């Protein structure tokens, strides 16, 4: 997502998975220097105050660093071309898998001695068409996909380092004076956090912030502070989704244009304080099926 200039809201019901991911991304090393990866960890007043200190630190770290623009443009163009080829290859592969499944289904139906008219349609129409499409796509080898992956770690880290610097340096633009005024304010942490939360509650300000920090990490409950309840991020990634109740999960979900749920169906369900008797009465009143039982399910298991 970062290399394709997409914005991401990384959310979870609990702090632990969020902190683990943020910590790893903030500790990427390039030739003895920490990559100033543009991710912002938001949350309660304490987390928000820490985020403001992070913004100030990254700004001071990056503002004087030279950025090899031409090199970045070349690397970006190369990676974009490879990503496009890889996407096309994966789409072909998915299509081949679909065709193979259709072929197997047709062959099973033929073995079942279907009615004559239906059998003729399968043998003379559908099966030859599927075979023609499979022949046209040809064989797709794993090596074809591996060849398109970026295997040069040094070059990748260099690109990541200078691209991150490029993002952070945008804070020097005049449009960010109001944000930097909050960051540099002499107010106490609680007052600064309140001012920042008011700032990002405005959709236009959130949009500006995402030009500098395209990756935002926060808990589901704290995501309500991010602009209006409408899609502001290209993608929402929800970790430990099997422990997120449906209602709380909707807070980050409705802020993204696409969604990735990461979870384990064997994990315990979320802790929900709704009385079982009330839940049963509400299910009966609104004809809620078992699959959508609020107590028994999570956003991952629905």
Language-model segments: residues:
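P-loop NTPase Walker
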Residues: 1-98, 105-108
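A general structural signal for short secondary-structure junctions and capping/turn motifs
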Residues: 31-33, 206-210, 250-253
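Generic, well-ordered alpha-helical scaffold segments in large soluble proteins
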Residues: 1-4, 20-24, 28, 216, ...
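Conserved helicase motor core of SF1/SF2 NTP-dependent helicases
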Residues: 221-238, 242-302
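Feature representing long, continuous alpha-helical segments
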Residues: 16-19, 23, 211, 215, ...
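Short, glycine/acidic-rich beta->alpha junctions
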Residues: 2, 13, 17, 198, ...
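Conserved helicase NTPase catalytic core signature
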Residues: 110-233
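Beta-sheet entry/capping signal
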Residues: 7-9, 38-39, 214-216, 234-235, ...
């Amino acid at each position: 997502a970062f290399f394709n200039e997409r914005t991401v809201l990384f959310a979870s019901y609990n702090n632990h998975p969020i902190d683990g991911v943020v910590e790893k991304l903030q500790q990427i090393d390039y030739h003895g220097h920490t990559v100033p990866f543009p991710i912002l960890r938001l949350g309660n007043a304490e987390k928000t105050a820490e985020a403001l200190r992070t913004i100030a630190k990254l700004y001071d770290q990056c503002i004087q660093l030279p950025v090899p623009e031409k090199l970045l443009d070349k690397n970006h163009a190369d990676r974009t071309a490879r990503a496009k080829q890889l996407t096309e290859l994966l789409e072909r592969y998915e299509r081949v898998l679909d065709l193979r499944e259709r072929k197997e289904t047709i062959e099973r139906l033929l073995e079942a001695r279907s009615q004559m008219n239906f059998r003729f349609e399968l043998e003379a129409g559908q099966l030859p068409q599927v075979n023609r499409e499979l022949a046209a796509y040809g064989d797709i080898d794993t090596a074809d996909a591996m060849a398109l992956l970026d295997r040069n770690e040094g070059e990748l880290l260099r690109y990541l380092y200078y691209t991150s610097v490029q993002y952070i340096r945008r804070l020097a633009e005049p449009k960010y004076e109001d944000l930097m005024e909050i960051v540099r304010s002499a107010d106490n942490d609680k007052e600064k956090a309140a001012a920042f939360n008011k700032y990002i509650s405005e959709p236009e300000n959130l949009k500006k912030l995402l030009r500098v920090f395209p990756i935002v990490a926060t808990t589901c409950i704290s995501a309500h502070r991010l602009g209006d309840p409408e899609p502001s991020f290209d993608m929402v990634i929800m970790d430990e989704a099997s422990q997120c109740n449906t209602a709380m999960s909707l807070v980050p979900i409705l802020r993204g244009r696409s969604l990735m749920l990461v979870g384990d169906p064997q994990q315990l369900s979320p802790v929900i304080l709704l009385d079982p008797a009330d839940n049963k009465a509400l299910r009966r009143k609104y004809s809620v099926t078992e699959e959508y039982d609020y107590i028994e399910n999570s956003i991952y298991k629905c």
